[in-house]
């Protein structure tokens, strides 16, 4: 891939993604797959007048070794130096860039029960810090190819060819054009217009149906609002949280989901795949989960904490999106969630509450925003999916027909 094109992508992530401010610290989380591209992002951040850029590297084989050899207690510890670092982030409010490239099967064989328990131990210690940062910072999740990931997506190709093909797919779906900043401005305008229409309907609940057996009704929070594309932090800084993105989303009301939903794509969770699964809800809670592959992993995910079995997001994505029309199964939630309508189990988004900036997190949760240590998207959209909005006045409005927008 030409370095000039990659440079444009790095600039897009820094300028339109997190929108680095002069004097702001930047955190970059990355795997070891693309050090040269990470260097480009660091260079672009400094060109944007970042005060300091810190890169935190991840390597899945090391994570497997840690889980294998450390006790649950050790894995779940948060030492004082880590607490001090978290407090530093709360104090300075850095922007965060996550560059995803990990192998979808990279943690296969890991002791998931041990890993889950360690996360449960860490969560109550880390949560107060993340709560203090909620909606204050800018963040962006983007992707770069990893060799194992590329081979998973394009299994019949040589590694080099697969990497090039995955780069092409990432750049195309991320709108890295001759003028990517302008392309994103136009895309954001379209998503914001659709959200404005959805908000004008005052939808009380969404009813999903599809030929695969999906028949699910999800209740909405009266004070909730649809969002999509770029967002504005509480510091007043506009940023794009996901590159790419095609969704209009909202957080539903905890406790109001009835019926069954069938996943339309595999879910990559903690470095392992869950395939051909369904989840049945009663009174908002996931009470039954079945999967042809990864069923125990799915059940472990749903049992992570009390909120993990409730919904935190409903997102609408047409089958005519660039990612869907590419015909590529990415085995990566960032992309696959933007190829199909999806739901998320776990944490809801407080910023989907109107006037959220004048409310506390606890007040948002009282209104119905779910709280959890997880937020896991799973794809449900398909060519036969129909979605109706049941409005406050009882009127039924078609939102999706045959997998695409009905308006």
Residue ranges, per PLM feature:
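Active-site bordering "gate/hinge" segments
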Residues: 1-258, 389, 395, 405-407
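Extended hydrophobic packing segments that form well-structured cores
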Residues: 362-407
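Short solvent-exposed loop/turn micro-motifs enriched in small/polar/acidic residues
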Residues: 11, 199-201, 270-272, 307, ...
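Long, well-ordered mid-to-C-terminal structural blocks that present hydrophobic/aromatic surfaces
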Residues: 250-306
């Amino acid at each position: 891939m030409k370095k000039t094109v990659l440079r444009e992508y790095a600039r897009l992530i820094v300028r339109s993604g997190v929108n680095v401010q002069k004097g702001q610290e930047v955190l970059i989380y990355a795997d070891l797959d693309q050090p040269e591209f990470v260097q480009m992002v660091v260079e672009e951040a400094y060109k944007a007048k970042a005060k300091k850029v810190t890169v935190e590297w991840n390597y899945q084989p090391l994570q497997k070794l840690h889980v294998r050899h450390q006790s649950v207690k050790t894995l779940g510890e948060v030492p004082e130096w880590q607490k001090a670092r978290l407090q530093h982030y709360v104090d300075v409010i850095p922007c965060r860039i996550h560059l995803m490239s990990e192998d979808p099967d990279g943690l296969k064989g890991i002791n998931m029960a041990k890993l889950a328990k360690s996360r449960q131990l860490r969560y109550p210690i880390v949560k107060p810090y993340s709560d203090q940062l909620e909606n204050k910072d800018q963040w962006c999740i983007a992707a770069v190819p990893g060799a194992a990931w590329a081979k998973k997506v394009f299994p019949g190709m040589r590694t080099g060819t697969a990497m090039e093909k995955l780069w092409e797919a990432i750049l195309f779906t991320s709108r890295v054009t001759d003028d990517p900043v302008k392309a994103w401005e136009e895309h954001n305008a379209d998503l914001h217009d659709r959200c404005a229409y959805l908000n004008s309907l005052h939808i009380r609940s969404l009813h999903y149906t599809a030929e695969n057996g999906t028949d699910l009704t999800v209740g909405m929070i009266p004070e909730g609002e649809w969002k999509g594309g770029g967002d504005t932090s509480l510091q007043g800084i506009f940023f794009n949280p996901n590159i790419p993105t095609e969704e209009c989303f909202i957080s539903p009301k905890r406790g109001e989901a009835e019926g069954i939903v069938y996943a339309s794509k595999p879910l990559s969770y903690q470095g392992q795949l869950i395939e051909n699964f369904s989840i049945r809800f009663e009174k908002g809670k996931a009470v039954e989960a079945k999967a042809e592959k990864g069923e125990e992993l799915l059940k472990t995910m749903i049992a992570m904490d009390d909120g993990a079995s409730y919904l935190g997001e409903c997102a609408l994505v047409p089958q005519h999106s660039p990612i869907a029309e590419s015909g590529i199964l990415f085995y990566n939630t960032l992309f696959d969630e933007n190829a199909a309508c999806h739901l998320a189990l776990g944490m809801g988004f407080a910023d989907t509450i109107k006037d959220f900036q004048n409310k506390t997190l606890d007040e948002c949760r009282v209104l119905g925003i779910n709280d959890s240590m997880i937020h896991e998207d799973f794809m449900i959209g398909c060519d036969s999916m129909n979605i109706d909005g049941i409005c406050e006045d009882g009127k039924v409005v078609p939102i999706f027909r045959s997998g695409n927008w009905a308006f």
